[in-house]
């Protein structure tokens, strides 16, 4: 590997695209402490805050997705795209990267397109079981694709698609050793079951309403909650914070949140699914319906088809949530079976395997 490695990572919009990119950057830095790493994301999105918190520089592009319903915002999309392509060209010219890595999200498309046009090695990290339109287009000319699901080879060029799994935070590999610390951190009772509720980094309105409506039921069942409400809804629901309901806008110590949990209620974003497989706890997935091509439901089904989790769609929640979820809480054998089966789906070395592919690409270039 050459001295002075220079890497651009691009991805964002949601935590599911940001945290894999940060995990890859951390592994590159671990192997090559002198590496220069630059992030590129969508301006005004959460990556502009989360990436600097992780210790990396980031530049923003004026870019967003296309609204799938009719919207006036779509009329300015071509101007955003042209602006982002122009800025991406300038960023690449100035930074001179050895490789460009895209983890999905609005910002990665323009940057990868310019990198490909200039013959710079490119790696796409596809988290979902159903790839988005941008990655489908870019995959034809990208150097390599690292994916989490075997079925994406039906969409991507199979000869350059490698199944590595999704990058996960390395601190999640030891959550089974952190139970006592986790209960103390969240000030929870060791004598009650703990349910962790995750609605994604921004929050999930339907999940928050569900939990609000069932707070008495949780209390009656002797269950305590760690409830990640999300940035968009925290002011509305923070009033429920109590000794048995730990209401949080955002959870910085996810390793401890997972360690405290007996059962987890979660969206089914690709990054979350990968983390939950590594953690190995029983899960109820409530996929977001507000995503392209219903990919969260497909991510969840890739787990449930192995008898490794439950899934309830938002349309089914009113009828099915209480009987399904609370019967699971009382069924230790089923909880243990789900935990064992979901753990079998984990690919805990994904981050390392992806950086191995980065090294191969750069070594082939030199």
Swiss-Prot record:
Q: Which UniProt keywords apply?
A: Cell cycle, Cell division, Cell inner membrane, Cell membrane, Cell shape, Cell wall biogenesis/degradation, Glycosyltransferase, Membrane, Peptidoglycan synthesis, Transferase
**Which Pfam families has this protein been placed in?**
Glyco_tran_28_C, Glyco_transf_28
Which GO biological process categories is it annotated with? carbohydrate metabolic process; cell division; cell wall organization; lipid glycosylation; peptidoglycan biosynthetic process; regulation of cell shape
Q: What class of enzyme is it?
A: transferase
- The residues listed in the UniProt record as binding UDP-N-acetyl-alpha-D-glucosamine, with positions renumbered to this chain, are 14-16, 128, 169, 201, 251, 296
Q: What Enzyme Commission number(s) apply to this enzyme?
A: 2.4.1.227
Q: What is its main location?
A: membrane
The answer on whether this UniProt entry bears the keyword Protease reads no
The record ties this protein, via CDD domains, to:
GT28_MurG
| GO cellular component terms, A-Z | plasma membrane
Protein topology in the membrane: Peripheral membrane protein
Task: Enumerate the subcellular locations listed in this protein's record, separating them with semicolons.
Answer: Cell inner membrane
In the record, the note on similarity to other proteins reads: Belongs to the glycosyltransferase 28 family. MurG subfamily.
The record ties this protein, via NCBIfam families, to: murG (TIGR01133)
Describe its function. Answer: Cell wall formation. Catalyzes the transfer of a GlcNAc subunit on undecaprenyl-pyrophosphoryl-MurNAc-pentapeptide (lipid intermediate I) to form undecaprenyl-pyrophosphoryl-MurNAc-(pentapeptide)GlcNAc (lipid intermediate II).
Identification of the protein by name:
UDP-N-acetylglucosamine--N-acetylmuramyl-(pentapeptide) pyrophosphoryl-undecaprenol N-acetylglucosamine transferase
Species per Swiss-Prot/TrEMBL record? Christiangramia forsetii (strain DSM 17595 / CGMCC 1.15422 / KT0803)
Tell me what gene encodes this: murG
């Amino acid at each position: 590997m050459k001295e002075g490695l220079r890497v651009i990572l691009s991805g964002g919009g949601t935590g599911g695209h940001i945290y894999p990119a940060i995990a890859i950057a951390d592994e590159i830095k671990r192997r090559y402490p002198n590496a220069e790493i630059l992030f590129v994301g969508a301006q005004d999105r959460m990556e502009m805050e989360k990436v600097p918190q992780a210790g990396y520089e980031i530049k923003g592009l004026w870019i967003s997705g296309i609204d799938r319903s009719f919207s006036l915002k779509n009329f300015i999309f071509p101007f955003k795209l042209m602006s982002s392509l122009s800025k991406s060209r300038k960023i690449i010219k100035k930074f001179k990267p050895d490789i460009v890595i895209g983890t999905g999200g609005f910002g990665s498309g323009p940057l990868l397109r310019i990198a490909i046009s200039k013959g710079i090695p490119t790696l796409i990290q596809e988290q979902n079981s159903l790839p988005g339109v941008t990655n489908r287009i870019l995959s034809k000319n990208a150097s390599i694709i690292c994916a989490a699901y075997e079925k994406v080879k039906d969409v991507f060029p199979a000869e350059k698609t490698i199944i590595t799994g999704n990058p996960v935070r390395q601190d999640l590999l030891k959550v089974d050793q952190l139970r006592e610390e986790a209960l103390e951190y969240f000030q929870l009772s060791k004598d009650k079951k703990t349910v962790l509720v995750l609605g994604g980094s921004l929050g999930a309105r339907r999940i928050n309403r569900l939990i609000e409506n069932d707070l008495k039921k949780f209390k009656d069942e002797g269950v305590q909650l760690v409830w990640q409400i999300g940035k968009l809804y925290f002011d509305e629901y923070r009033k429920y914070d109590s000794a048995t309901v730990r209401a949080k806008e955002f959870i910085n110590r996810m390793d401890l949140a997972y360690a405290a949990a007996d059962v987890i209620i979660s969206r089914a974003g690709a990054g979350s699914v990968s983390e939950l497989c590594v953690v190995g706890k029983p899960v109820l997935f409530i996929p977001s319906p507000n995503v392209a091509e219903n990919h969260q439901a497909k991510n969840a089904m890739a787990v449930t088809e192995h008898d490794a989790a439950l899934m309830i769609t938002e349309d089914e929640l009113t009828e099915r949530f209480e009987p399904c979820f609370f019967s699971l809480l009382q069924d230790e054998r089923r909880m243990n079976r789900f935990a064992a089966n979901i753990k079998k789906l984990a690919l805990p070395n994904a981050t390392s395997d992806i950086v191995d592919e980065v090294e191969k690409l750069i070594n082939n270039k030199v």
